[in-house]
Amino acid sequence: MKLSARNQLKGKIARVEKGRTTGHVQIDIGKGIIITASITNEAIDELKLKKGNDAVAVIKASDVIVGKL
């Protein structure tokens, strides 16, 4: 898969949790760092996302959400 986005973090899916319409996918990128993405349940199904799959988190600056730790 080729993308123009430069902020790509490779890892393994640690967890997939589906809600009513939107799900959360956690990607373990190593060193104890987990990236969580909110995507539609339809996207989870179409991509056949499962725990243990190799995955990549693609981050666009316009889509980054900041939370307080």
What are these regions (language model features)?
Residues M1-L69:
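Non-catalytic connector elements of ABC transporters
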